[in-house]
Design a protein with these regions (language model features):
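Pyridoxal 5′-phosphate
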Residues: 1-380
Length: 380
């Protein structure tokens, strides 16, 4: 049997349930919860008795260091914010696409990525070009084919939340760079599950939520901004983005020269502590080993489903296949809903996205989880 990479006892719900849904609301480990509770009990409840202004001004630094390690980036380029949408919603104003130029999006991407552009297009007058993802086509190539001299921005997820399709960001970034097109990548469904080296990509902005594969709680997210983007002022400025947030002269603006200027205000510090602990745990396990683990379990699942009616949106042989998010199709749409409900009743939690069964494989999953899922799907 394929054993879990992490200690399953650190996730109490796994004693009674099979959780294949980290792509939605991710599980929090005992270590993460312990650190969050410790902070709440020993610091947060005591206000400034336990945290001075100077300590608060530097409170995000440990998380910033770990995020930089995770992405193999420089700390000065790392932004800590309350949500991925906090950055995504500013990008249309930050990048200012020209009137009548083209912004390329994926029509089935997560709405947080597309909706800021849809709203901005009404007033800025640029064109939205939706690329449609289909199983028979390579999504990376479909995106590249739409890039032309009139394109201003490409904004897309590294891994699609519903299908698990993983685009080739390096290849895409080579084309956007050549054409003078800005590239924005959301790695929410990738960071923590597959290795990311920001130096391999030539992009402008990266964003990521903290409550899925990174193992944190809601209310905290991360971003990376290129040196070129850092030369610009954030469209939305908060008090905490100042070089020294606690210099309280309300008549002066002295923004940080780093991505710290994107932190707008007091964050959920308990979520900061939780995400920092969760990322430390992931780094200890090794992101590469986590990816290899999901590869093995995905292979097991495909072997179990070999003679069933269930088929993956992306075949395992596809270069765009992601082993940690598997989107399963069935000839009968009713079978998908009924199977999902039956699995849930029996304590196996997965998801339905875009009319398909979505299976998320994490480091705490083992061969028995996949065996149970395979057997249940064969009964349909």
């Amino acid at each position: 049997m394929i054993n879990a990479l992490s200690n399953r006892s650190g996730y109490p719900c796994l004693s009674q349930n099979i959780y294949l849904n980290q792509a939605s609301l991710g599980l929090l480990s005992d270590k993460t919860v312990t650190e969050m509770t410790k902070f709440l009990d020993t610091v947060a409840r005591y206000g400034n008795l336990k945290m001075t202004d100077e300590e608060e001004a530097h409170f995000l630094n440990p998380l910033r260091r770990n995020v930089a390690t995770l992405l193999q980036a420089k700390q000065k380029n790392i932004a800590i914010v309350a949500s991925a949408s906090e950055i995504l919603s500013q990008i249309p104003e930050l990048c200012k696409p020209k009137r009548n130029s083209k912004v390329i999006l994926v029509s089935t991407d997560f709405p947080a990525i597309t909706r800021p552009w849809l709203g901005s297009a009404k007033t800025r007058g640029f064109e939205i070009c939706f690329v449609h993802e289909i199983p028979e086509a390579d999504l990376t190539q479909s995106l590249i084919e739409k890039i032309d001299s009139n394109t201003s921005i490409v904004c897309v997820s590294y891994v699609q939340f519903a299908s698990g399709t993983r685009i080739d960001v390096k290849e895409l970034s080579q084309h956007t760079k050549k054409m003078g097109v800005k590239l924005v990548i959301d790695v929410t469904q990738a960071a923590g599950a597959i290795p990311i080296n920001i130096n391999d990509w030539d992009l402008d902005i990266l964003v990521c939520s903290g409550y899925k594969w990174l193992g944190g709680h809601g209310g905290i997210a991360i971003g990376w901004l290129s040196d070129e983007i850092l030369e610009l002022e954030p469209p939305t400025i908060g008090w905490f983005g100042n070089e020294n947030p606690f210099e309280m002269d309300a008549t002066k603006l002295n923004l940080s020269k780093t991505a710290a200027k994107y932190t707008q205000s007091t964050l959920s510090y308990i979520s900061v502590v939780g995400l920092n602990a969760a990322i430390e745990q992931l780094l200890e396990i090794s992101i590469l080993e986590i990816m290899k683990h999901s590869d093995k379990l995905a292979q097991q699942l495909f072997s179990n489903l070999l003679y069933s009616e269930w088929k993956s949106f992306r075949p395992i042989t596809s270069r765009e296949f992601s082993s940690h998010i598997i989107s399963l199709m069935h000839p009968s749409g009713d079978a998908i809903k009924s199977t999902f409900e039956q699995l849930s009743e029996n304590g196996l939690i997965c998801g339905i996205r875009n009319g398909r069964l979505r299976v998320s494989i994490s480091h705490y999953n083992n061969g028995n989880d996949i065996k149970y899922l395979g057997a249940a799907l064969h009964h349909e």
